[in-house]
Every structure is written in C-alpha cells, then in structure tokens.
C-alpha cells in the first residue's frame, strides 16, 4: 500500500520520480493567468487568519460545503471566520476523490509545513492555531508567500477602466523582484446584451476621454486603454467566451447596433453576434500589432441559480459546463483574424472536456511560421483542473499537436495558497510521462524528457509571453 502524500506523491514509476525531483520540482513559477488582487501585493497584505487566506472568496470550497449540507451563512454569510473554517474542516473528509482533498493537503504542506496530518474536526484546532502563528510572520505576507513559492511572474486580471495604480506601485518597488503585470479583460465592453453595458460605456468613455456613440468611438476608447495597459507592461488579454458567436457586419450596421443599444433597445442574437465578432476581430489585430497573447476561455454556463444570483451576485459557485457547439464559429473567428495576418498568439481553453479534440485540432489550422506553438490548447480549466482533466488535456494535446511546446500550468486562482497547483500539475505531468516510458511508449532518455519537462513547467511560458523577468 502506498502512503498518502509523501514526497513521491503520484510518482508511481522510478522514471517519474527522477523527472520530478531532478527536473520539475525546482522550476520557478510563471503564473500567467490568475485573479489575485494586485492591491494586496502592492500593500504586502498580512492575512488575519487561515480563513482570510484560504476560504474567503473560494467558490470551489463553497460548492463542496453546500453539497455537504452546510448553511450559506457558513459559506458566504455572516458567520465568524472560525465558524466558517470549522465548517470547511468538517467537509474536507467528505471530499476524498475531489481535487479539493489533494489541494487542501498540498496547501497545508506548502507553505505551512504540515505533513502527516489530515484536516478534519479533530485536527481543526491544531491546524488553525499552527497556521495562524505562521501567518503572523513576515515571510507569510502576500509577497512573502510568493517568494517562498519561487514565483517569477504573475498576470492579474484587470478591467480596461482600471487605473493600474497598484501595478505601478509594485513596479516602482525595487526591493520586490517578482513581475506583477496586468492582463486585459474587456468582457464588459464586449457583452453588449448585458444590462450593465450602457453604464459601462459611460465609464469607459470617461476614463478614455471619448464620447462613445459610433463603433469607431469605441475603437478609439479601447485603443487608448490598450496603450494605458501597455505602458504598465501588459502582454496578455483574456476573454470569457461563454458562447462563441460569429457574424460579420459593415461599419454602418455596427454604428446602428451600438446606437440602438445605447438608446436602451434590446438587440437580436444576430446583432449581438455581429457586435461581438467586430470587437474580437478589432482587438485581435491590436494584440497582434503589440505582440500580445490572447486567451479565450470558452463554454461556461454562468449564474444558473437565479435565486442565489439575486441574493449573492456572480462568481460564488453557481456556474457549470455549457454544451453549445463552438467549432464552426470559432473557426470562422480565427480565420477572420488571420485574413490580414493579424491573428495574435492565442491560447484556447474549453470548459466542456467533450471539446478537447475540437481545440486540439483547431490550433493546428492556424500555427505561425517561425513561432513554435503560436496557437495553444490551454491547460485543464476550472472543472477540468483536476487529475483526470489535466491528463486528458495533455494526452490529447500530445496526440493532436506538440506537448513539448505546451506553455503549461496556471493557477487561475484568487488565493495566494494556490501555487501548489503548479506542483500538482508537475507531479501529474511526470507521472504521465513516466508511465509512457514504463510501457515502452517513450524512450527512457532522461535528458530528452527532462528538458521537455523543464520547458513545460517554465521555459515555454517564459519564451511564449516574451516578458523580461527580473
């Protein structure tokens, strides 16, 4: 029987153990997409307690707690921090088989150094007190944890109207060497069907000093904000494409669509598709000219529980996987961006694992001469960010493309403790390749495969995003 979560966790062949310990383990972290609050990094935030750093804002944990029958006041409500932690500790033993069980104990190991102890009601007091004592130390501040985890770069997620003042503050601090760069997330300027669109256009117009009436005005406003982001080191965009749409329109049609929406009219689905297509094609060209990477996160079905949405708002654990087709529209969109050779480097993520092969084959249609891995099939996202999901994504990428050119893992997280997801990914990667070697499906060449692992863990992302590190 194999003990739980030793130093060789998941490494079930000798070759996998060598790959991980000699090549993967000590690679730095290039976390190119996350949702960490830049203000906390700028202020070097000190966490009040284990709840503050670990459970606050974590919709993965809330979903599990709700499934375990925990009252909402202990998830998002007015219960005390300790009450919420105790509710989580009581839920953890029920999460065996869920990635939360592995994540929880990896996060207790690093950075807290807690090994050989499982979180449960019987250990909750000891773990709460031990972690809180450590969180009071300087090296467990926001920056301290990032430095402990050997992070070299993080890309936060930022709205076009953001001032980016916290990124500027971080960049001016010569004592902190980790790159913290903004990522452009223009969903609110894109989702014309949303009730908040008109208010957002007013805010965008104000910060860009542009009166947005026609589509060209919107382009002007977005260009000014792109310049603002570029001045703060941005090299990455991110789009939530819950549904991929494609429909072309001329300038007069786009002007009419925008004007009628600003006047309060409801648009048809075709008109929404026309507007979204035009925005994505315009932005894609801007990204290409600037050498940016665009990311498309495709296929979320959001805010399913209307009663809870009205009570709690979005992003609190009531989203799931959509099953709408996307291949044809995505193909047309990428082809349109490519017509003028202005398709930027692109990472495609799908939430429905049914679509893995769709994306795995789609990227092969639009690769770029002289640019290894220009089009990427992104790592297992959200509900696929678990052992089977990551194995499926990497196996299918290997079968349909080049795994060796993969830009690897990202946390996509709001928590400073989530860097162990890179460790989890690396262990799974080494396990998978080790099994290939054991079965005679890959050569037992430690130098060849070791370099491949190092590249997937760090080097490929560093080179792909072309961000100069400190």
From Swiss-Prot:
Q: Does the keyword Isomerase apply?
A: yes
According to its UniProt record, in which pathway does this protein act? Carbohydrate metabolism; pentose and glucuronate interconversion
Classify the source by domain of life: Bacteria
Q: Which InterPro entries does the record cross-reference, listed alphabetically? A: Metal_Hydrolase, Uronate_isomerase
SUPFAM superfamilies on file: Metallo-dependent hydrolases
E.C. number, please?
5.3.1.12
Q: Which GO terms describe its biological process?
A: D-galacturonate catabolic process; D-glucuronate catabolic process
Q: Does the keyword Ribosomal protein apply?
A: no
EC top class named in words: isomerase
MF annotations from Gene Ontology? glucuronate isomerase activity
Q: Which reaction does it catalyse?
A: D-glucuronate = D-fructuronate; aldehydo-D-galacturonate = keto-D-tagaturonate
Q: Which keywords describe this protein according to UniProt? A: Isomerase
One protein family per Pfam: UxaC
Output the NCBIfam families linked to this UniProt entry. PRK02925.1 (NF002794)
Task: State the similarity comment.
Answer: Belongs to the metallo-dependent hydrolases superfamily. Uronate isomerase family.
UniProt-recorded name of the protein: Uronate isomerase
Q: What is the lineage of its organism?
A: Bacteria, Pseudomonadati, Pseudomonadota, Gammaproteobacteria, Enterobacterales
Gene name of the record: uxaC
């Amino acid at each position: 029987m194999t003990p739980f979560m030793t130093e060789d966790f998941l490494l079930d062949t000798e070759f996998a153990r060598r790959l991980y310990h000699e090549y993967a383990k000590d690679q730095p972290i290039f976390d190119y997409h996350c949702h960490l609050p830049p203000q906390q990094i700028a202020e070097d935030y000190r966490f009040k307690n284990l709840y503050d750093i670990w459970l606050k804002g974590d919709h993965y944990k809330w979903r599990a707690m709700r499934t375990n029958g925990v009252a909402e006041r202990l998830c998002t409500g007015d219960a005390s921090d300790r009450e919420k932690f105790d509710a989580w500790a009581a839920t953890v033993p029920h999460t065996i088989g869920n990635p939360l069980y592995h994540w929880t104990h990896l996060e207790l190991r690093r950075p807290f150094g807690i090994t050989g102890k499982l979180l449960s009601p019987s250990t909750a007091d000891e773990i709460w007190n031990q972690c809180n004592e450590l969180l009071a130390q300087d090296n467990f501040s926001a920056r301290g944890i990032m430095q402990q985890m050997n992070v070299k770069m993080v890309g936060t997620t930022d709205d076009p109207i953001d001032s980016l003042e916290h990124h500027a503050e971080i960049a001016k601090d010569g004592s902190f060497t980790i790159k913290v760069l903004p990522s452009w997330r223009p969903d609110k300027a894109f989702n014309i069907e949303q009730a908040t669109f008109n208010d957002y256009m007013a805010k965008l117009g104000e910060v860009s000093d542009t009166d947005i009436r026609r589509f060209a005005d919107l382009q002007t406003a977005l260009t000014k904000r792109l310049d603002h982001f570029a001045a703060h080191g941005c090299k990455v965009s991110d789009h939530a494409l819950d549904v991929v749409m494609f429909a072309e329109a001329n300038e007069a049609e786009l002007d009419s669509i925008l004007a009628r929406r600003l006047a309060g009219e409801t648009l048809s689905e075709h008109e929404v598709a026309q507007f979204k297509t035009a925005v994505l094609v315009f932005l894609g060209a801007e990204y290409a000219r600037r050498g940016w990477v665009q990311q498309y996160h495709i296929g979320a079905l959001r805010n399913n529980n209307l009663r809870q949405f009205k009570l709690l708002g979005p992003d609190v654990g009531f989203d799931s996987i959509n099953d709408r087709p996307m291949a044809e529209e995505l193909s047309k969109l990428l082809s349109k961006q490519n017509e003028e050779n202005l398709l930027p480097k692109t990472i495609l993520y799908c939430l429905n694992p049914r679509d893995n092969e769709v994306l795995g084959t789609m990227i092969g249609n639009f690769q770029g001469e002289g640019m290894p891995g220009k089009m990427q099939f992104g790592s297992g996202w959200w509900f696929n960010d678990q052992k089977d999901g990551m194995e499926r994504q990497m196996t299918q990428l290997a079968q349909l493309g080049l795994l060796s050119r993969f830009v690897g893992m990202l946390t996509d997280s709001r928590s400073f403790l989530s860097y162990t997801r890179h460790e989890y990914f690396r262990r799974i990667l080494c396990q998978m390749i080790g099994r290939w070697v054991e079965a005679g499906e890959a050569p037992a060449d430690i130098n060849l495969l070791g370099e491949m692992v190092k590249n997937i863990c760090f080097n490929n992302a560093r080179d792909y995003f072309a961000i100069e590190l400190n």
